[in-house]
Every structure is written in C-alpha cells, then in structure tokens.
Amino acid sequence: MPAATKDSDGGWKKFLWNSEKKEFLGRTGGSWAKILLFYVIFYGCLAGIFIGTIQALLLTINDFKPVYQDRVAPPGLSHTPRSEKSEMSFKVGDPSTYQKYVKAMHDFLQAYNDSKQENMMKYEDCGDTPKSYINRGELDNNQGIKKACIFRRSWLDKCSGLEDPTFGFSEGKPCLIVKLNRIVNFRPRPPTSNDSIPEEAQSKVQPDVIPIYCTNKREEDAAKVREIKYYGIQEGFPLQYYPYYGKQLHPQYLQPLVAVHFTNLTMATELRIECRVYGQNIAYSDKDRYRGRFDVKFTINES
C-alpha cells in the first residue's frame, strides 16, 4: 500500500468544493436553490395549516361564555387558611405556631374590607338576607361590566378578624373561612328535601341559601368535637351572589363567605373534621376530596 502523502486528504476537500463541476457538498447551485425552494414552500404550507386550525379554534371560543360548560364539574369547597395535607397543628401559648394561619386569613379578607367596596359604580348592596339569583344580563359585553354584590367582612362576626385579630387561634378556638369556588354562570340550587342531609343539619335547609355543615369525620371523635358556630348570611351561601360572570365581565366579584368557628375542640389530640355543602346540583367525588366538601385535621396543644 502506498504511503499517504502530506497532500492526501481522503477527498473531503473535493467533496466540500468541486471546482471542476462547480459543486458544493455534492450539489450545484441550481440543485441547492431547488431544495431551498422546496423546503420554503413545504414549511410555509405547514405553518399555514397550523395558523388556519388555530384561527378556526378561536372562532369557536367565546370570550365571555365557556363553550363546553356542560363538562365542568360541580364547584369545589375550599377554606382559608390552607395547610399542607389539610393538617393544622399549633400551640395556644406560642403565637409563632399559628401566625402563618392568621396572616393567610388577614390577607384573604383584605378584599372584603369596607374601604375596598365603596365605589357604587362597581358594587351594589344586595342585602344581608338570602334572596334569589340576580340576573345581570347575558354572558356578553353588551351591557358592560357587571356590578358585584357587597359582602361585608363584619358579617363574619367573631371570625372577621376585626375584633379578634387572631381569629380565635390564641384561645384554641380557631376559625376557618369557607367559600364555594367560582364557576362561570353556575347557579347552585338549594336542597328541596332532607333526604340526603344528616339529621343534625336539616334545620339549615331554607330557600335561597346553600347550607353548610361541619362535623367529626370519625365516630370516636364525636365527644371531642362539640359546639361549632357559623357566621355569614344566614350561615350559608346566599343565591343573590350568583351567577358569576367571569373575570372580564365581573372583575370585582366577591364570593359569599361562611366562617366556621370551632369553639370547643378537645386539646392535645388529633381531630379530623369534615365540612359539606348541600344542593341539588352539588355532588361529591371520592377522587376529588374538595368537590362539595373538604376535611381538615386539627391538633391543638396548650403550649
């Protein structure tokens, strides 16, 4: 085999540029131009198809009304303060153990301060007793921005944070602020019978309000979870705050709240409590523990 010379390059230089055939990487200028033109047209068509499908999709979307709302699940029931795994543990004699809960409640209730609801161009007084739904028109902007019902923080009484800034945590009598999550154009329907409601909660069934009831989740805790008080409009979610028209049409909307006050919990033991709302179109799911209900675990110690 002849020895390789210093000029030997394996032919790669000629492959890069063949001066005899005027080829770059094995193709002439005309060939490269045809390939470039092909890919420009090919990817241009792909981009056109993609843009066309997006435009077609956007034509089916209403800016104000959900198209497939029949597939939306019933609203979830959530509470403030939230905690990891819904477990709340604190010491009555150590404010640092419950300060994060108190701060979360104050932050959440800022929007419900009277000073934030003074503009009567954005808010209206819907009363402090339950009423039927308020019809503010269709889900479009023909009538402009919808007014929101006022909900006064003071209606939460001892759980408002106005008189007791610790929301009962400093006494071992904690509060939870409960709300139904927002769903556009959803109208919760109150129960019409007591068939699906625990006997202890049947007195809460009344027109124009969605009742809420909390109790011990485990039978062995029945004697340890005693008096529970509820604050808000008729201790439930009044219908005049529904429906919700969405962020664009209802930017000032305030959800009605219910404060749950646990006034007599046994200390130094783990207690699991479940809260549920009751309505004709409110369902529960084992796969979603916040659909129409939630449970929370308290562990309260003296110090």
From Swiss-Prot:
The keyword RNA-binding does not apply. It is found in: Cell membrane. It is a single-pass type II membrane protein. Residues 1-34 are cytoplasmic. One of its GO terms (biological process) is intracellular sodium ion homeostasis. Keywords: Cell membrane, Disulfide bond, Glycoprotein, Ion transport, Membrane, Potassium, Potassium transport, Signal-anchor, Sodium, Sodium transport, Sodium/potassium transport, Transmembrane, Transmembrane helix, Transport. Residues 56-303 are extracellular. One of its GO terms (cellular component) is sodium:potassium-exchanging ATPase complex. Detected in all tissues except liver and cardiac muscle. Highest levels found in intestine, ovary and kidney with marginally lower levels in brain, spleen, esophagus, eye and pancreas, intermediate levels in gill and low levels in white and red skeletal muscle. InterPro entries: Na/K_ATPase_sub_beta (IPR000402), Na/K_ATPase_sub_beta_sf (IPR038702). Gene3D superfamilies: Na, k-atpase alpha subunit (2.60.40.1660). The chain crosses the membrane at residues 35-55. Disulfide bonds join 126-149, 159-175, 214-275. GO terms for molecular function: ATPase activator activity. Glycans are attached at residues 113, 194, 264. NCBIfam families: Na_K_ATPase_bet. This is the non-catalytic component of the active enzyme, which catalyzes the hydrolysis of ATP coupled with the exchange of Na(+) and K(+) ions across the plasma membrane. The beta subunit regulates, through assembly of alpha/beta heterodimers, the number of sodium pumps transported to the plasma membrane. Belongs to the X(+)/potassium ATPases subunit beta family. The sodium/potassium-transporting ATPase is composed of a catalytic alpha subunit, an auxiliary non-catalytic beta subunit and an additional regulatory subunit. This is Sodium/potassium-transporting ATPase subunit beta-1. It comes from Anguilla anguilla. The gene is atp1b1.
